Amino acid sequence: MSTDLNYSATRDPFSALGLDVGNRRIGVAGSDGLGLLATGLGVIRRRSLPEDIAQVQAWIRRRQATVVVVGIPLLADGSVGSQARKVQRFVRALQAAVDLPVVTVNEYLSTVQAEWDLRQAGIPAKAQKALIDQQSAAVILQTWLDERRYSQSSKAPCR
């Protein structure tokens, strides 16, 4: 498992896929071609690990992803709990199945942020339930994109 903020795509255009892996659903988000903005794309209904991986591979092909970013639900103190261990198992299976970087980020409070984002956008409460997983994936991916951009800009030489 790695949080690789310095990953730079060698293929054009840049395309990152973000995943919020839950017990029942996997939220999916994608980046724009510049790696600036994340947008929720959809949801994968979980069935079995091989089927889930196949569905993620389909999203990778569809989006021509150059990197996959998966949120790890660490506990408030940063430690790994039972849900994080489940997601880590998923990440290992995904890494074995795809030929591109799979990186992880701490997704602590991503669902809270996603709920707030949906409320601020004026999405009715009933409609939020259908969108929360993909919005959480977008929050996870946006976190990685922002950290990556900040990391790259802080390494730029001062002029």
Swiss-Prot record:
EC number of this enzyme: 3.1.-.-
Keyword Hydrolase: yes
Keywords from the UniProt entry: Cytoplasm, Hydrolase, Nuclease, Ribosome biogenesis
Subcellular compartments: Cytoplasm
GO BP of this protein: rRNA 5'-end processing
One Pfam short name: RuvX
Entry GO CC: cytosol
GO MF annotation terms: nuclease activity
Highest taxon, organism lineage: Bacteria
Keyword Nucleotide-binding: no
Database matches in CDD domains: YqgF
Function: Could be a nuclease involved in processing of the 5'-end of pre-16S rRNA.
Sequence similarity: Belongs to the YqgF nuclease family.
HAMAP family reported in the protein's UniProt record: Nuclease_YqgF
UniProt protein name: Putative pre-16S rRNA nuclease
